Amino acid sequence: DRLDALRWIESADELFGDPFSGVRIVVHGISMGAATAMMVAGEVEHGLHQLPYVKCFVADCGYTSVWEQFKSELSAQFNLPAFPLLHISNWLCQLRYGWNFKEASPLEAVKRCSLPILFIHGDADTFVPTSMVHELYEAKSSPKELWLAPGVDHAHAYRDCTEEYTKQVKDFLNDYMQ
């Protein structure tokens, strides 16, 4: 997903940008999209992806890693421990597809990002535990912001708190989209 998102960002600059246009992009994702946005955040300034027109990120209810999310769901939904099921699944994924669950780590990605990230999370989220946003926030160096939507479950912060959500995002963009 992150590579597709990076290609879209590069395409947007090719389609809409020129050296004088001042293209500015914010990458905003919800749930798995937030995880993708954070994975992109870890690559925008490093390696082959020098994308100076990406100015900031909004990550709404993203998880710390695929491994931790699967582990959480195995426990919450099925009352199963991670071992051996998650370990075997991870091994099979590595054999068949050449990657493993631990590689998909937004937590590690945000550690590499110096651009601003607004973290949003419902404080009643049980699908992606709210504790994960605190881990992400602590791992990210400044600039960063955190807004916890009160009484909100997974991926419903905008739906349930539209006015405050809009204000939080708008204020963040006003601060960082120059």
Language-model segments: residues:
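Acidic catalytic loop of the alpha/beta-hydrolase fold
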Residues: 123-128, 155-156
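Alpha/beta-hydrolase active-site loop
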Residues: 1-17
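Catalytic histidine-centered segment of alpha/beta-hydrolase-like enzymes
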Residues: 152-166
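Short beta-strand immediately N-terminal to the catalytic nucleophile in serine-hydrolase-like folds
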Residues: 26-29, 60, 120
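Gly/Ala-rich beta-loop-alpha elbow adjacent to hydrolase catalytic centers
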Residues: 29-33, 37
